[in-house]
Amino acid sequence: MINLRKTHPLMKIINHSFIDLPAPSNISAWWNFGSLLGICLVIQILTGLFLAMHYTSDTLTAFSSVAHICRDVNYGWLIRNLHANGASMFFMCLFLHVGRGIYYGSYLYKETWNIGVILLLTVMATAFVGYVLPWGQMSFWGATVITNLLSAIPYIGTTLAEWIWGGFAVDKATLTRFFAFHFILPFIIMALVIVHLLFLHETGSNNPSGINPDSDKIPFHPYYTIKDALGLMFLLLVLLSLALFSPDSLGDPDNFSPANPLNTPPHIKPEWYFLFAYAILRSIPNKLGGVLALLASILILLIIPFLHTANQRSMMFRPVSQTLFWILTANLITLTWIGGQPVEQPFIIIGQLASILYFTLLLVLMPLAGMFENYMLEAQR
């Protein structure tokens, strides 16, 4: 009997990607985040679609349309809370996924890694334009501050900023186009995810040891489908707990006030998942320098594969690199904390030191640690 799963043109692709895919037998729970990110994306697209049915992208009605969704639409409050907190879960999984890639040397699959970095940037852009849509105080001022950074670009900056705004300031035209961007970008993300998986399946998954796993592979289904289902249960538990018990704990109280261009909030800050980059931006007194540092903080991921000096792929057996990795993690948490603090001492100096350490770790210390570990292994022979 012909197995349709293995012969049908469309089902064959799904079969080779999610069912009969040969996977390393030793991949740990750190490999769950890819599937969780896929689920987060589906949740965000579905909840976003239902929100878009009731939302109006006009400065006069945007804020009240969000209030209308929460008050009058059937389960609108739940859809909105799932969408807002789903973004936080998305970024939590993203950061853990990228961290896993750095720790276990997955960045040596260069094509997969580069598409992943482009995905990270696209998701960040989507989240930024999405945060503007409720048209609260922090939405408006966040959009004003961040888009205004474009004016720091020499010669074309001011023209570029006004072109993005569709006027001389953030206004109705900006909100309308941001809604259009926020609607289309998730579908672009979906296309990039397919390319990401395409490149991944060219090489196969990495594994914790960093050793070629071809000699010992198992089918993805049922082993890893069950494992991913467990991860999904945890994700839904956390997401539903957030959305149902404390839906506003990760938001900003200022966003409960409608946007007022005449009243600046005392402390403008983005959502928590941008705070590390925002802290790096603020740590440089020069506007253009800050913008370049902000870009570099993300784009530095693209050069990580070229800074790999160790003979071993994974950090599993490299204690010096492990120590530096966890210092980097602590440093990013520190930057996230600093990004949410007012611009005053001692936060300024802490932010500057943490920013310097961030770049020093990735560009200097980690490559040196790899070389040192090579030397120590050679010395043992």
Curated annotation (Swiss-Prot):
One of its GO terms (biological process) is mitochondrial electron transport, ubiquinol to cytochrome c. Keywords: Electron transport, Heme, Iron, Membrane, Metal-binding, Mitochondrion, Mitochondrion inner membrane, Respiratory chain, Transmembrane, Transmembrane helix, Transport, Ubiquinone. The chain crosses the membrane at residues 33-53, 77-98, 113-133, 178-198, 226-246, 288-308, 320-340, 347-367. The keyword Glycosyltransferase does not apply. The keyword Heme applies. A ubiquinone binds at H201. InterPro entries: Cyt_b/b6_C (IPR005798), Cyt_b/b6_C_sf (IPR036150), Cyt_b/b6_N (IPR005797), Cytb/b6-like_sf (IPR027387), Cytochrome_b (IPR030689), Cytochrome_b_C_euk/bac (IPR048260), Cytochrome_b_N_euk/bac (IPR048259), Di-haem_cyt_TM (IPR016174). Heme b b566 binds at H97, H196. It is found in: Mitochondrion inner membrane. Binds 2 heme b groups non-covalently. Heme b b562 binds at H83, H182. It is a multi-pass membrane protein. Pfam families: Cytochrom_B_C, Cytochrome_B. GO terms for cellular component: mitochondrial inner membrane; respiratory chain complex III. Disulfide bonds: none annotated. PROSITE patterns: CYTB_CTER (PS51003), CYTB_NTER (PS51002). Its cofactor is heme b. GO terms for molecular function: metal ion binding; ubiquinol-cytochrome-c reductase activity. Belongs to the cytochrome b family. Component of the ubiquinol-cytochrome c reductase complex (complex III or cytochrome b-c1 complex) that is part of the mitochondrial respiratory chain. The b-c1 complex mediates electron transfer from ubiquinol to cytochrome c. Contributes to the generation of a proton gradient across the mitochondrial membrane that is then used for ATP synthesis. Heme 1 (or BL or b562) is low-potential and absorbs at about 562 nm, and heme 2 (or BH or b566) is high-potential and absorbs at about 566 nm. The cytochrome bc1 complex contains 11 subunits: 3 respiratory subunits (MT-CYB, CYC1 and UQCRFS1), 2 core proteins (UQCRC1 and UQCRC2) and 6 low-molecular weight proteins (UQCRH/QCR6, UQCRB/QCR7, UQCRQ/QCR8, UQCR10/QCR9, UQCR11/QCR10 and a cleavage product of UQCRFS1). This cytochrome bc1 complex then forms a dimer. This is Cytochrome b. It comes from Sminthopsis gilberti.
